[in-house]
Amino acid sequence: MDPPTRPSVSGPRTRARPPPPEALPTVGFEEEVYDCLDYYYLRDFPASGAGRSKGRTRREQQLRTNYPVPGGHERKVAQILLNGQRKRRQRQLQPRPRTRLA
């Protein structure tokens, strides 16, 4: 019986041939030059400086913005009223100081 033959390790290896150029899909100039990230940066980031946008995209700016309230400074007015009520309550709880004139 003959021993089983092994393939030679040092022999030449065959490489897969690339497909002919006709079989490759044709791509336009923009698809060839730009990839997905390039389109992302071109579309979403504003043209102004980095300090103005805080590094956010336009979409993030629209989602996380403080919309102007048509009533004006409502929070400020409400805080002033609450502070006044708190002061009134504190004055009522404290006894009035005695003076010599009264």
Curated annotation (Swiss-Prot):
Residues 1-26, 46-102 are annotated as: Disordered. InterPro entries: NUPR1-like (IPR018792). Signal peptide: none annotated. Pfam families: Phospho_p8. Disulfide bonds: none annotated. Coiled coil: none annotated. The keyword Transcription regulation applies. Its main location: nucleus. One of its GO terms (cellular component) is nucleus. Residues 85-102 have a biased composition (Basic residues). Acts as a transcriptional repressor by inhibiting gene expression at the NUPR1 promoter in a p53/TP53-dependent manner in cancer cells. Involved in the G1 cell cycle arrest, and in a decrease in cell viability and cell proliferation of pancreatic cancer cells. Plays a role as a negative regulator of the protumoral factor NUPR1. Belongs to the NUPR family. This is Nuclear protein 2. It comes from Mus musculus (Mouse).
